[in-house]
Regions:
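Catalytic or ion-translocation cores adjacent to nucleophile or general acid/base/metal-coordination motifs
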Residues: 236, 245-265, 274-328, 332-335
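Beta-rich nucleic-acid/ligand-interaction surfaces
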Residues: 260-268, 346-352
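Hydrophobic faces of well-ordered beta-strands that scaffold small-molecule active sites
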Residues: 209, 253, 270-272
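Helical scaffold of the NTase/Pol beta-like nucleotidyltransferase catalytic core
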Residues: 194-198, 226-253
Length: 505
């Protein structure tokens, strides 16, 4: 049985062109070593269109029965099957050479190849990504993308407990450091033996390009600094974003904000995220045009979007960078008590920006989303953060991906919403169920809104209402609301920018 699985896996690698015919014996013997086997009887049966997921399952089941890992959980299985797949992954220098060769023909050919390679090697577990639930919800801001993430493994209590007993390690320093490439992993750090990273320069500084293993959207890429330095929204950041889309015009690239609450989950390592995807925010129209003094050549406007987005566009990226520098400089120190915007309290800074760059034909576009992380007694996790009544759907930060209109909702909602649908159809009070009690008030609102909820329409209704809750999360994160007072506040800020003198460099 295991001989068949080994042959299938080697055949898969040949089919995907990860290895060549001359590599078969070497790779087979490498697998035997990992599996603790001394011999191999090659099956006569030939295989075609090998299913990677089921073949790896066979190998993992065999390995667990042979006590090659202690617990039959996702954490241990992922560590082991990454070691197995590393047998077929080429050396970094060869991968880089192939990428650069294709890049000279076309940036898109290079990324197409690299994305497929990252899936074929099982670094991106495509069969898991397919399990994510996805739909679109119509809102006043256009269709929002809603996803419930099922591909990222849940934290394993046994692995967490075992990790606490292990000797603590600070290598790699974080999951974005270049030193992850080829790392075998441990219980509290994923295996990265199958990852390959592409080096390149942004403004004369060394960065690397890789894909996210969880692919929240098409060709979800991560661009990260070669050094372990903190995130920072500044001149260099704007230069890097626009420099990247100049190199890869079919991609977008953005940065999480550099402050807690409004930033992402990793603030300690300078990095950006992007990919080959048109986000809902990019489809949103300019609601009102803005004229910035000394920048009449730059098209600018407020975007019709729940967060406060200033869209800048020009053929000249240097002009965008200069204006973005000015807007950021003013925003960092800007206080408007009338709009409850404070640059700092007790020495703690609050104002920052979530920037995103993309290209539309020959125009460079820079989206500058104004953020503020102030907390209050009423909103201890942030005034411009999803408010408490929405936490039953999303309590986490509104980071870069959500800012652009794609909800990455927690996996717990898969079971909770399925149960809630059943309760809505059968008129059961969710408050009586520990799994769904957090949704009880929301369920009442849904019942009041829809007079006829039945088994044929309940899923569509719950999905729509989930999307509308996400839209409200984005509205909460907006520093200027979509009303007259919000527009007046936005205008006051722009007036302040226009009064700011230019810095001569």
């Amino acid at each position: 049985m295991i001989d068949q699985s080994i042959k299938k896996l080697v055949t898969y690698a040949l089919e995907k062109k990860l290895i060549k015919e001359d590599d078969k014996i070497y790779c087979t013997n490498s697998l035997l070593a990992i599996l603790g086997l001394d011999e191999y009887n090659e099956p006569k049966e030939e295989y075609k269109n090998v299913n990677l997921e089921s073949t790896l399952k066979e190998i993992l089941d065999f390995a667990f029965e042979k006590n090659l890992f202690p617990e039959n959980t996702t954490v241990y299985r992922d560590l082991f099957d990454t070691k197995v797949m590393s047998v077929f992954v080429d050396r970094p220098s060869n991968v880089i050479k192939e990428f650069n060769t294709k890049y000279r023909t076309s940036p898109k050919k290079a990324t197409d190849w690299f994305y497929k390679f990252s899936q074929d090697t099982d670094y991106i577990r495509a069969y898991r990504v397919k399990k994510d639930l996805k739909w679109k919800t119509a809102t006043p801001y256009g269709d929002l993308d809603i996803t419930i993430n099922l591909s990222k493994p849940e934290k394993d209590p046994k692995a967490i407990a075992a990790a606490k007993l292990m000797k603590q390690s600070s290598y790699p320093k974080c999951q974005l450091c270049p030193s992850n490439e080829g790392y075998a992993g441990r219980l509290n750090h994923p295996a990265r033996e199958t990852i390959r990273i592409i080096p390149f320069e942004l403004s004369g500084k060394k960065y690397f390009f890789q894909y996210s293993p969880y692919s929240y959207f098409n060709e979800h890429a991560i661009v990260f600094n070669s050094e372990h330095v903190p995130m920072a929204i500044n001149h260099d950041c704007f230069e890097h974003l626009l420099g990247f889309v100049e190199k890869f015009p079919h991609y977008i690239l953005g940065s999480n904000a550099d402050l807690p609450i409004v930033g992402g989950s990793i603030l300690t390592h300078d990095h950006y995220q992007g990919g080959n995807y048109i986000f809902p925010m990019f489809k949103a129209p300019i609601e009102e045009e803005i004229v910035f003094t000394n920048y009449t050549d730059v098209k600018a406007g407020y975007v019709k979007w729940p967060l406060s987005d200033i869209r800048l566009s020009s053929r000249d990226p240097k002009r965008l960078i200069a204006l973005a520098d000015k807007i950021l400089r003013v925003w960092r120190g800007y206080t408007d008590e009338q709009s409850f915007i404070y640059a700092e309290t007790n020495g703690e800074p609050h104002n920052t920006i979530t920037p995103i760059a993309h290209k539309v034909k020959d125009q460079y576009v820079l989206e500058l989303v104004l953020r503020n992380n102030i907390t209050t007694d009423q909103y201890p996790l942030g005034l411009y953060h999803p408010h408490q009544e929405l936490w039953h759907i999303k309590k986490e930060n509104i980071g870069l991906i959500e800012v652009m209109g794609l909800a990455v909702l927690p996996s717990r909602l898969n079971k909770e919403l399925a149960k809630l649908e059943d309760e809505l159809v059968n008129n059961i009070d969710p408050a009586s169920d520990p799994l769904t009690e957090k949704h009880a008030d929301w369920a009442k609102q849904i019942k009041e809104k829809y007079s006829d909820i039945n088994s044929s329409n309940v899923k569509e209704i719950v999905e729509r209402e989930t999307g509308l809750v996400f839209a409200r999360c984005l509205e909460d994160a907006g520093v200027y609301k979509q009303d007259e007072a919000g527009l007046e506040g936005f205008n006051r800020f722009v007036e302040r920018v226009n009064k700011e003198p230019e810095i001569i460099k």
